[in-house]
């Protein structure tokens, strides 16, 4: 299963079990073929850091079983930054992101990635409106 980005409350995800559907936890977005290394590259572009440093901005919130799946929390530094983006900025960051090696290696159309980033920004804008919400990634490992 592809990773899923989900908007929700941390305490709700702490109760999630391996038998539960993560899509029922709140508004969500499938990452499709966009894996962790590619997301780290996006975070690096947003923050002006190395992708190795960007790994620190997505961390374990809850482990559903010994070998996963995992609920990862996306740091608010990332979500707050994305929440401020206007349409032209979304297009610009997507263009730069597509030129990075983890994204070049994926079999994904530029329009699909642009749509993903627009939807991600929308979730981040919703998150910014409600202090109790955060953005999580459901990752099977």
Regions found by a protein language model. Give the residues of each.
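Acidic (Asp/Glu-rich) sequence patches and key acidic residues
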Residues: 1-130, 138-141
């Amino acid at each position: 299963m592809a990773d899923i980005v989900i908007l929700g409350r941390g305490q709700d995800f702490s109760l999630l079990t391996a038998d539960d559907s993560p899509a029922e936890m709140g508004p969500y977005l499938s990452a499709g073929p966009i894996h962790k290394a590619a997301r780290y590259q996006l975070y690096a572009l947003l923050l002006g850091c190395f992708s190795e440093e960007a790994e620190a901005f997505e961390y374990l919130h809850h482990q559903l079983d010994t070998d996963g799946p995992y609920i990862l929390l996306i740091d608010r530094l990332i979500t707050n930054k994305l929440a401020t983006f206007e349409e032209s900025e979304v297009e610009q960051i997507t263009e730069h992101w597509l030129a990075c090696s983890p994204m070049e290696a994926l079999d994904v159309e530029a329009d699909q990635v642009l749509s993903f980033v627009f939807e991600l920004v929308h979730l981040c804008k919703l998150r910014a409106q409600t202090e109790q919400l955060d953005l999580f990634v459901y990752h099977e490992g």
